[in-house]
Design a protein with these regions (language model features):
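Short, internal active-site loops enriched in acidic
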Residues: 67-69
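Structural signature of FAD isoalloxazine-binding scaffolds in flavoprotein oxidoreductases
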Residues: 8
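Short glycine-rich phosphate-binding loop at a beta-alpha junction
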Residues: 58-65
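Acyl-thioester C-C bond-transforming condensing/cleaving domain
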Residues: 2-5, 13-58, 71-76, 82-197
């Protein structure tokens, strides 16, 4: 079993407010609203490999996570981000979710793989674009069949669900993930500047 596991280097994409939010200066967010989480993950993986002088061919495993699956290829997002970063298709790639802790869990999972001797080099991290969170119409499968639009004059009686809010709101405490992290920062005295560093 490996005793020493190190993070060689890292890269991150710009941090932007989601499309429905406001930036610190009061202007609307959404600067990266048209860039998928997978593309952002690909960019971060390429950057980390370049900064650490590591060839994509030397990667033994890719582990990427996110809170919400917000684009059409998101179910296997790690694979698409890894392939986009030119990691060979033979390399196993794992997508996971631990809500806001997904990126950190990816690093923990990658470290465990190395410690157990399953891999020597693991790319691990998170990717997200909440501006692309879909709206969901629950019950539509029962009402309308796939590829058949509603008939003229029919009313949609299903409630529209905002996937962003329903998935990031903790039903037990009634708070959103961001509110929870803000509260923890207040209690621990962590500033926004320290958080972003």
């Amino acid at each position: 079993m490996a005793e020493d596991v190190v993070i060689v280097n890292g890269a991150r994409t710009p941090f932007c407010e989601w499309q429905g939010g406001k930036r610190g200066d009061g202007n609307p967010g959404g600067l990266l609203k048209d860039v998928s989480a997978i593309k952002l993950g690909e960019i971060a993986i390429k950057g980390a490999l370049e900064k650490s002088n590591t060839s994509p061919k030397d990667v033994d495993h890719v582990v990427m996570g996110y809170a919400l699956q917000t684009c059409d290829q998101a179910i296997f997002g790690a694979r698409h981000a890894g392939l986009g970063a030119e990691i060979p298709q033979e390399v196993p790639m794992l997508t996971l979710s631990r809500i806001c802790g997904s990126g950190v869990q990816s690093i923990v999972t990658g470290a465990q793989m190395i410690m157990l001797g399953e891999a020597n080099t693991v790319v691990a991290g998170g990717m997200e674009n909440l501006s692309q969170a879909p709206h969901v119409l629950r019950g539509m499968r029962d009402t309308y069949k796939l590829a058949r639009p509603p008939k003229a004059g029919t009313e949609l009686e299903k409630d529209m669900e905002d996937y962003l809010f329903t998935n990031l709101l903790d039903g037990f405490c009634g708070s959103f993930m961001a509110q929870t992290s803000d509260e923890i920062c207040k209690r621990k005295g962590v500033t926004r500047e320290e958080t972003d560093a």
